[in-house]
């Protein structure tokens, strides 16, 4: 799963350090967009495969296989952990063999995750074996995402030049959240008619379509850039804004894993509407307000954004109607959108210019950690206290993030 920064400064010399696009949205020239369009479309199709199973997988693991909420959390969160653990290797491969190689390897691997979903659904396997096959699919999807996203980001930057890195980040970020917003409702719509196997078929086909697009794009040289600065050397400079980012990611991760189950517990239909509201608000705010951290100050924007997130999570927690849950999800997306660029500004200003791109790559890892850890941890909480606890935890995380903003300012002065 999983986060983006508004960042207009020069990128790192090693494009492998730019793994999750985080950019301020600007309207590129038509010629620029024509060059980026195949890359953006490939990202969109690749991430459809990532997002389509999210809501449907929760129902498959709980209702069909008979496992509890904690297992649901693990099944969903393991993909993000796999993405985090393979991020460095994917970047190294991209540098050594070129972006095209990474993309053409990563997209078929992502398609294999869809195949695993199909096999787990149609083969006469026991519940534990089916779950194991699903988990293998999730792990393969995590590796595939690391490869194709790193490669497509690097490919896009190489095609338009480092001066247009911000435009590449912006459009790729929008493609990712458009896919996340459309994928989950699509999966939930397909599942009642064709079962989870139908969801798996779509998750198999979409990355292959992206692979066909990538196959037609001209290759660019491998960067062969310098070694990346070790994470621990940058960690001391960026951990405060990074931790705020991680805490702000908890509500999104909780919604991805448990919003569908929350709807089911209440007997409501159309959980995908709430997820669509989240993504629509995220994209709209990113398009219209990406310059606010520069104009109003990163900390001020982050405070307002986190407040919206907290209110949204409380609304979902206390929702007595589907409309209230949709409103809560929409407010969560509205707030989540600008936490990334705001904290990204603080993180990149905390390091020397020559390490700024590396700081971006390591900063994004905080969101990966949150995406991977939230599902299992919140799953255990919901097992003891009910599904609604997931959103209470999300609200609490944003409140802790608000408190941490004071230490972010202190850390910058120190």
Task: Give each language-model segment a name.
Residues 34-75, 80, 244, 252-262, ...:
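Helix-loop boundary and gating motifs at the non-cytosolic
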Residues 80-88, 180-181, 282-287, 372:
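Residue-level signature of mid-helix packing/kink "hotspots" within the transmembrane helices
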Residues 86-98, 285-298, 382-383:
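Helix-to-loop junctions at the C-terminal end of transmembrane segments
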Residues 108-127, 308-320:
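C-terminal ends and interior cores of transmembrane alpha-helices
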Residues 137-175:
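Cytoplasmic helix-loop-helix junction between adjacent transmembrane helices
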Residues 171-215:
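Helix-loop-helix hairpin linking two adjacent transmembrane segments in secondary transporters
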Residues 204-223, 404-409:
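C-terminal membrane-cytosol helix-exit motif in multi-pass small-molecule transporters
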């Amino acid at each position: 799963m999983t986060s983006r920064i508004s960042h207009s400064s020069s990128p790192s010399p090693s494009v492998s350090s730019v793994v999750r696009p985080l950019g301020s949205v600007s309207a590129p020239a038509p010629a620029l967009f024509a060059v980026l369009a195949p890359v953006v479309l490939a990202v969109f199709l690749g991430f459809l495969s990532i997002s389509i199973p999210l809501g449907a997988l929760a129902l498959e693991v709980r209702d069909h296989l008979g496992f509890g909420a904690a297992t649901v959390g693990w099944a969903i969160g393991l993909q993000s952990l796999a993405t985090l653990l393979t991020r460095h290797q994917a970047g190294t491969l991209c540098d050594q063999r070129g972006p095209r190689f990474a993309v053409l390897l990563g997209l078929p691997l992502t398609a294999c995750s869809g195949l695993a979903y199909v096999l787990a659904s149609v083969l006469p396997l026991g519940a534990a074996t089916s779950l194991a096959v699903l988990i293998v699919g999730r792990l393969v999807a995590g590796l595939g995402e690391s490869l194709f996203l790193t490669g497509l980001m690097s490919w896009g930057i190489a095609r338009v030049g480092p001066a247009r890195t911000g435009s590449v980040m912006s459009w790729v970020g929008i493609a990712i959240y458009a896919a996340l917003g459309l994928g989950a409702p699509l999966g939930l719509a397909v599942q009642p008619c064709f079962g989870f196997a139908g969801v798996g078929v779509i998750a198999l086909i979409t990355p292959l379509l992206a692979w066909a697009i990538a196959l037609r794009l001209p290759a660019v040289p491998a960067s062969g850039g310098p070694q990346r600065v070790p994470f621990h050397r940058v960690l001391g400079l960026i951990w405060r804004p990074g931790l705020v980012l991680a805490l702000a990611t908890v509500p999104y991760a909780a919604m991805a894993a448990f919003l569908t189950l929350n709807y089911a517990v209440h007997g409501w239909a159309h959980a995908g509407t709430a997820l669509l509201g989240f993504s629509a608000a995220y994209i709209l705010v990113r398009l219209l307000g990406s310059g606010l951290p520069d104009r109003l100050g990163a900390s001020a924007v982050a405070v307002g954004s986190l407040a919206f997130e907290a209110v949204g999570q409380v609304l979902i927690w206390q929702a007595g109607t589907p409309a209230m849950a949709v409103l809560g999800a929409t407010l969560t997306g509205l707030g989540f959108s600008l936490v990334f660029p705001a904290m990204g500004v603080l993180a990149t200003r905390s390091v020397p210019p020559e390490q700024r791109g590396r700081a971006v790559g390591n900063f994004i890892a905080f969101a990966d950690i949150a995406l991977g850890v939230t599902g299992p941890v919140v799953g255990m909480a919901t097992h003891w206290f009910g599904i609604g606890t997931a959103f209470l935890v999300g609200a609490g995380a944003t409140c802790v993030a608000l408190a941490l903003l004071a230490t972010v300012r202190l850390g910058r002065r120190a």
